[in-house]
């Protein structure tokens, strides 16, 4: 209990922390991290995770990882469950659509799992072709690869069916505001931490490609370069009680 109290005081944590001597509770719930060998000093820790609960204490969302170094950021979880964000955004407008981009987090560290967000709003009578469409250029997001960054496939929302009667064709499109999310993990391996230690920021670049049409005109495919810069912060390696 003294260890938890010292940790809470150092990190200004005001909510209750529960002690789990012998990892009894996490074993009961199947959360003990089975990737950690018994001889390892960290044996007995849980899989890193966050449970989101409602006012009645019911679990409404779960976010877990296998490596104990990886953590979903609070901001990325809030965006995932539909909460508003105050993240600074970049806005770009074209005759076909408006684009707003932001990172869920302004600063990350080794092991951070966060998200890059693109909000697209097609103009009046305009639609953008959805992934999987053939014959047109579907919307796509291509991240430029770089060391120590892991990327999940971009997440696109469900599309809608658009019927173009003159050609008797039905295709999947986005005609209403929609969001693309790119989940990013900063590696926490030894080589990654050594390389990131000398860096104070991280810039991620990508290319957004789409083709927009209205009820009369098929516009040429458009390519938009997009970038995000996040600050890199050092890991907190101080143990509870300053030991």
Residue ranges with predicted function:
Residues 41-101:
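Thiol-/selenol-based redox modules, centered on thioredoxin-like
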Residues 26-30:
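Short, charged, surface-exposed secondary-structure boundary motifs
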Residues 19, 63-65, 130:
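Glycine-rich, histidine-containing beta strand-loop boundary motifs that form or position
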Residues 1, 21-22, 56, 122, ...:
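A generic "binding-loop/recognition-motif" signal
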Residues 78-243:
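Extracellular/lumen-exposed scaffold segments
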Residues 1-25:
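Structural microenvironment flanking redox-active thiols in thiol-disulfide oxidoreductases
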Residues 12-16, 31-51:
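Structural micro-motif
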């Amino acid at each position: 209990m003294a260890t938890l109290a010292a940790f809470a005081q150092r990190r200004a944590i005001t909510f209750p922390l529960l002690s789990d001597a012998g990892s009894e509770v996490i074993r009961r719930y199947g959360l003990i991290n089975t990737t950690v060998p018994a001889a390892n000093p960290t044996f007995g820790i849980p899989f890193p995770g966050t449970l989101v609960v409602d006012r009645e204490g019911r679990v409404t969302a779960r976010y877990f990882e296998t490596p104990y170094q990886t953590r979903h950021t609070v901001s990325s979880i809030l965006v995932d469950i539909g909460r508003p964000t105050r993240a600074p955004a970049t806005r770009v407008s074209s005759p076909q659509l408006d684009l707003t981009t932001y990172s869920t987090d302004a600063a990350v560290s080794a092991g951070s799992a966060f998200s890059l967000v693109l909000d697209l709003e097609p103009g009046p009578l305009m639609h953008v072709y959805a992934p999987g469409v053939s014959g047109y250029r579907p919307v796509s997001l291509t991240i430029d690869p770089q060391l120590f960054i892991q990327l999940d496939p971009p997440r696109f929302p469900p599309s809608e069916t658009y019927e173009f009667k003159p050609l008797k064709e039905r295709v999947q499109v986005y005609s209403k505001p929609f969001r693309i999310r790119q989940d990013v993990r900063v590696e926490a391996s030894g080589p990654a931490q050594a390389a990131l230690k000398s860096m104070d920021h991280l810039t991620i670049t990508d290319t957004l490609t789409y083709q927009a049409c209205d009820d009369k005109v098929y516009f040429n495919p458009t390519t938009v370069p997009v970038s995000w810069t996040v600050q890199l912060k050092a890991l907190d390696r101080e143990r509870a009680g300053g030991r």
